[in-house]
């Protein structure tokens, strides 16, 4: 029966994988719904205060670029060929051979440079033109051939064109998408969890599918009780920090994180899914690798380490078991549990796996940085070639002996190794950090320029164009079955209680990596959601002519901000009423949908603006003269933060002005008021 369950779990997992490749959006069981266009008023202020509304910030975001491009191609009343030219340059940079680059560069020169030169409409500098002409005439077509144009294209777009974009519906749509992104609160309900694919010291790893996009991920779940039992809280939090550091920027050679969230019992990392097994497994199945095969893996791992070191992260646990293969055979570095940020302070702890740890890591109290990873790389490459660590002769398991050899023994390399390989390994396995390859100030560049990698096109490596020496079997789960992986003994943690102070440790644990979320959305549901939203907004406008006119009411007035909020209402104070609010320097106005009559509350009548909670939801509490209260709730985190800030600032400024104003200005004004009794007290029929 257990065998049948394992087979069914494998089949379900493989089917989910296949469907996620062909039509991930079709597999989505939840729907992403964009907020109404009126969200723009709040989101524009929210983003502007965080310096997120600049040309560079929007243009360099995936969704921002697509909306800006759509605006330039379809909505602006003038031709904007620069955007297409920019896209062509980006595609050109991905080309991996000189012949293709030469052909494409000539086509681009004819289409975007020569044609404009002939018609005297070329907007770019003479230096940029001459740079391209000079290199083309010599057939020097590097990936950076058009780089001067990238800078000038961006400069030409950031002025009037960007300002027009900011005034367009496409910027409104950008605000709608950003509101969704900044209001993500993940739970287990947002994923379909499939079979277990691995287990570690604190928890398990599962294959999973994100419900709203259909994209497949790996979900690493750490048991909070087990973490507490092993006093691993610092390690768990450190892994989340390290993953957040290395998961920004495009690095295809690290298992990156897209999300982190937690439940009452688990800490969850949502990571790149790697289906090809690990190098330790393949070493046992395939046997040792040749120099040529090892060179392939070394080159990809070097780029992964280079990315980490650029982020000032030292990995500290490089070994075959932590190198995972994807379904095509390319590799990524996984498990950053022992990684460390050395940007401000160098680590000195002795952590890692015996047989791969650098001498300076083993010497207690000695500080180190990225140097440790280059030594570990030498140990790992030796194992791929010989089947064992250079300091683990005759399969000894004595950790002290392994450490002693690491600190004292000069590795004897086999005669069968080529001179180039011997030079590489001797450089990496230097005990003296100052003499070690990669530690002379050049970092990964020192390895890239080593004779062992002569002839390697590193752009080719980055684009994963070299054929992998080993391709994992298709249609198989390259992981042990659930029975072999095993499970934790629940008795171990039976006596462990999670207290409020334990949960407080993880209050800042949730995280969304913006660029990775946007990439996921664009690959899956972006076009479909935009199309659905366009239809919904068109239907709403046709049904209610007042919709879309909220901003018209605010224009020409001193309105600070406007948008929807929920107001606690009805005689029994149990119902949230959705109203459209306008904040002015001296008052707060609102009206219901379809209502022409405005209600208002003056700043003179407010005694304080406070944050409160009702049923675990953050709310804004306005205390009103006479002992009454006015309670508001927002539909997203950014809205709540901005409304609370703007109401507080407006109230404080109004109070300051009222204290300075002559007494006759403080006479009560007639106003249409709506109040509610304190919602946390005994309720009665008085109030709204």
From Swiss-Prot:
GO terms for biological process: receptor internalization; signal transduction. The keyword Kinase applies. It catalyses: [beta-adrenergic receptor] + ATP = [beta-adrenergic receptor]-phosphate + ADP + H(+). Residues 558-652 form the PH domain. Residues 1-190 are annotated as: N-terminal. It is an enzyme of class 2 (transferase). It is found in: Postsynapse; Presynapse. Residues 454-521 form the AGC-kinase C-terminal domain. InterPro entries: AGC-kinase_C (IPR000961), GPCR_kinase (IPR000239), Kinase-like_dom_sf (IPR011009), PH-like_dom_sf (IPR011993), PH_domain (IPR001849), Prot_kinase_dom (IPR000719), Protein_kinase_ATP_BS (IPR017441), RGS (IPR016137). Its EC number is 2.7.11.15. Residues 191-453 form the Protein kinase domain. Gene3D superfamilies: 1.10.287.1270, Phosphorylase Kinase, domain 1, Pleckstrin-homology domain (PH domain)/Phosphotyrosine-binding domain (PTB), Transferase(Phosphotransferase) domain 1. Signal peptide: none annotated. ATP binds at residues 197-205, 220. The active site is at 317 (proton acceptor). GO terms for molecular function: ATP binding; beta-adrenergic receptor kinase activity; G protein-coupled receptor kinase activity. Keywords: ATP-binding, Cell projection, Kinase, Nucleotide-binding, Serine/threonine-protein kinase, Synapse, Transferase, Ubl conjugation. Residues 54-175 form the RGS domain. It holds the Pfam family Pkinase. Specifically phosphorylates the agonist-occupied form of the beta-adrenergic and closely related receptors. Belongs to the protein kinase superfamily. AGC Ser/Thr protein kinase family. GPRK subfamily. This is G protein-coupled receptor kinase 3.
């Amino acid at each position: 029966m257990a065998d049948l369950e394992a087979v069914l779990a494998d089949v379900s997992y493989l089917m989910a994988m296949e469907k996620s490749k062909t039509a991930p959006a079709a597999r989505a069981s939840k729907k992403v719904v964009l907020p109404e266009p009126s969200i723009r008023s709040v989101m524009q202020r929210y983003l502007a205060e965080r310096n997120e509304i600049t040309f560079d910030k929007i243009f360099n975001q995936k969704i921002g670029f697509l909306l800006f491009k759509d605006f330039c191609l379809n909505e602006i009343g003038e031709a904007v060929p620069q955007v297409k030219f920019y896209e062509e340059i980006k595609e050109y940079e991905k080309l991996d051979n000189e012949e293709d680059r030469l052909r494409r560069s000539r086509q681009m020169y004819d289409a975007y440079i020569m044609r404009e030169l002939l018609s005297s409409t070329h907007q770019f500098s003479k230096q940029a033109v001459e740079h391209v002409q000079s290199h083309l005439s010599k057939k020097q077509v590097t990936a950076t051939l058009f780089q001067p144009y990238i800078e000038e294209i961006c400069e030409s777009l950031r002025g009037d064109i960007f300002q027009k974009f900011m005034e367009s519906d496409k910027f409104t749509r950008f605000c709608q998408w950003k509101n969704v992104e900044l209001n993500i609160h993940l739970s287990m309900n947002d994923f379909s969890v499939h079979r277990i694919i691995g287990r570690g010291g604190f928890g398990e790893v599962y294959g999973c599918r994100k419900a709203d996009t259909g994209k497949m991920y790996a979900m690493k779940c750490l048991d909070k009780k087990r973490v507490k039992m092993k006093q691993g809280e610092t390690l768990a939090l450190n892994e989340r920090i390290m993953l957040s550091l290395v998961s920004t920027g495009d690095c295809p050679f690290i298992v990156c994180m897209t999300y982190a969230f937690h439940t009452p019992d688990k800490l969850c990392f949502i990571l790149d899914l790697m289906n090809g097994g690990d190098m330790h497994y393949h070493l046992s199945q395939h046997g040792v690798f040749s120099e040529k095969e090892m060179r392939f893996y070394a080159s990809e791992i070097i780029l992964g380490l280079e990315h980490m070191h650029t982020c000032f992260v030292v990995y500290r646990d490089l070994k075959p078991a932590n190198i995972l293969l994807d379904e095509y055979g390319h590799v990524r570095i996984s498990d950053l549990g022992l990684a460390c940020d050395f940007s401000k302070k160098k680590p000195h702890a002795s952590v890692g796996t015996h047989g791969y740890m650098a001498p300076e890591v083993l010497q207690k109290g000695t500080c180190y940085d990225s140097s440790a990873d280059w030594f570990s790389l030498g140990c790992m490459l030796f194992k791929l070639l010989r089947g064992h660590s250079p300091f683990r002769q005759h399969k000894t398991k004595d950790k002290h002996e392994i450490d002693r050899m690491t600190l004292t023994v000069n590795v004897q390399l086999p005669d069968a190794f080529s001179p180039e390989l011997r030079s590489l390994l001797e450089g990496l396995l230097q005990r003296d950090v100052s003499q070690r390859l990669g530690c002379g100030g050049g970092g990964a560049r020192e390895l890239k320029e080593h004779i062992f990698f002569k002839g390697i096109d590193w752009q080719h490596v980055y684009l994963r164009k070299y054929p992998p020496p080993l391709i994992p079997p298709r249609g198989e789960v390259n992981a042990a079955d659930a029975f072999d992986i095993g499970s934790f003994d629940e008795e171990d943690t039976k006596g462990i209680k999670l207290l409020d102070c334990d949960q407080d440790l993880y209050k800042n644990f949730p995280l969304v990596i913006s660029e990775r979320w946007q990439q996921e959305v664009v690959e899956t549901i972006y076009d479909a959601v935009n199309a659905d939203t366009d239809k919904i907004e068109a239907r709403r406008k046709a049904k209610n002519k007042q919709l879309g006119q909220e901003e018209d009411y605010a224009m020409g007035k001193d309105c600070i901000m406007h948008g929807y909020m929920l107001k606690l209402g009805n005689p029994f104070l149990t119902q949230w009423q959705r109203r459209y609010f306008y904040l002015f320097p001296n008052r707060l106005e609102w009206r219901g949908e379809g209502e022409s009559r405005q209600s208002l509350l003056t700043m003179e009548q407010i005694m304080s603006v406070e944050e409160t909670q009702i049923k675990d939801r953050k709310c804004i509490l306005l205390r009103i003269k006479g002992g009454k209260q006015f309670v508001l709730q927002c539909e997203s985190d950014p809205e709540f933060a901005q409304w609370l800030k703007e109401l507080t600032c407006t109230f404080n400024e109004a109070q300051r002005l009222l204290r300075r104003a002559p007494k006759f200005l403080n006479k009560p004004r007639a106003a249409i008021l709506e109040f509610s009794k304190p919602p946390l007290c005994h309720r009665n029929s008085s109030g709204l």
